[in-house]
Amino acid sequence: MKVLELGWLHKINRTRRLYSLRRYYHVETLFNGTLVTGGRDQETTGFAWWSGNARLINLSGKLLGAHVAHAGLIVFWAGAMNLFEVAHFIPEKPMYEQGLILLPHLATLGYGVGPGGEVIDTFPYFVSGVVHLISSAVLGFGGIYHSILGPETLEESFPFFGYVWKDKNKMTTILGIHLILLGLGSWLLVLKASYFGGVYDTWAPGGGDVRLITDATISPATIFGYLLKSPFGGDGWIVSVDNMEDIIGGHIWIGTLEIFGGIWHITTKPWPWARRAFVWSGEAYLSYSLAAISLMGFIACCMSWFNNTAYPSEFYGPTGPEASQSQAFTFLVRDQRLGANVASAQGPTGLGKYLMRSPTGEIIFGGETMRFWDFRGPWLEPLRGPNGLDLNKLKNDIQPWQERRAAEYMTHAPLGSLNSVGGVATEINAVNFVSPRSWLATSHFVLGFFFFIGHFWHAGRARAAAAGFEKGIDRDDEPVLSLKPLD
């Protein structure tokens, strides 16, 4: 019994050493012991200076300051970059030739553009930049105030804004507030599109125009049908949306569901199964957020690369399939004028040189672009009939604006690499074009990927902490502690 007792004592002592409060002091080490700020040093919080907001996990007032300041930085970038793009903008050139990523978004919302996506007024873009800059100043002052002067914790003075991470009811209330704000943001787009000036619709007759969306799709079968589609091939899940009515209708549904979902989460308490299923800690919520924003990043990647309705080609440049199809169309127009019989001409493989049959029997463009046979674009659709491309329309109905747009898109394929070596390999050195679609798709894919890895990292740590076996490195025996200080 004595031996057993001593054995347990040894085990308890070792457990105290490994699993004491020091298990929250992870492997970060201050490089300079003088960097101590108001009780937010490593010894107090368990996190070194470069762990940033982790030092503020239990200081709700200071964490509020960090978040408000962060929002200020984001809005400042938006305003500054907006004004930078306005200052460099050349109205005579397409937006996608000028490396712009913010002005195309404003143009898509219907600001400053007219028929065909032509920019007729840059003043709204200037106003947008100034409004964001002023807003960022307000947020910046708020961030500084709450970081330096405001209360360290909010629970005592402002209980409505205070919280404890383990308080499941408070956490779902905060979730509900966020959902309502997101829902209101979604409805702002609906109101802009339906009542306040409209949005740019690339499918408007004659090559696109700004118009009011007065008949948004509210059929649940249509809207939720996108979610039930396959993400592969020509199905394309929600990325396949190809009209503004469905886009605005989708925002009506999303906005409404988020508002009602927010009210639900504010007025109810989490059910027992949810209390058991989730880890309820600050790091767990971080991991959930990272997973969600990772998914948004991957969806934005596919949307900006493939979709030419939400991301009109007039502003973002053609999609890959669109540039390929426009090349086939351009040479069909040229050779038809030179006397070629585009319906029967054969290419070197014996297949149709200009036109051929798709797997489903439709008439499609021939040649290498056959792989993009199911492409749909506003400059091409008027030339289709009940069975694919209409021969009679190709011979008699091609409009000058379609020729011009196809020629422009043909020479602006989204092929540039991100080190700004643009164009195809055979292009002359003077050509250096990188499509905004290349930038937006690759950047969102990379960011989505790293957020995904961050989700795994923080989810693993949160689950380990909840299970009680997150111990890190035993700092007492760490070799570096026996070495001489660098200074």
Swiss-Prot record:
Full protein name: Photosystem II CP43 reaction center protein
Phylogenetic classification of the source organism: Eukaryota, Sar, Rhizaria, Cercozoa, Chlorarachniophyceae
Keyword tags: Acetylation, Chlorophyll, Chloroplast, Chromophore, Manganese, Membrane, Metal-binding, Phosphoprotein, Photosynthesis, Photosystem II, Plastid, Thylakoid, Transmembrane, Transmembrane helix
Subcellular location: Plastid, Chloroplast thylakoid membrane
Gene Ontology biological process: photosynthetic electron transport in photosystem II
Database matches in Gene3D superfamilies: photosystem ii from thermosynechococcus elongatus
Naturally occurring in which organism (per UniProt): Bigelowiella natans (Pedinomonas minutissima)
Bilayer topology: Multi-pass membrane protein
Record has Transport as a keyword: no
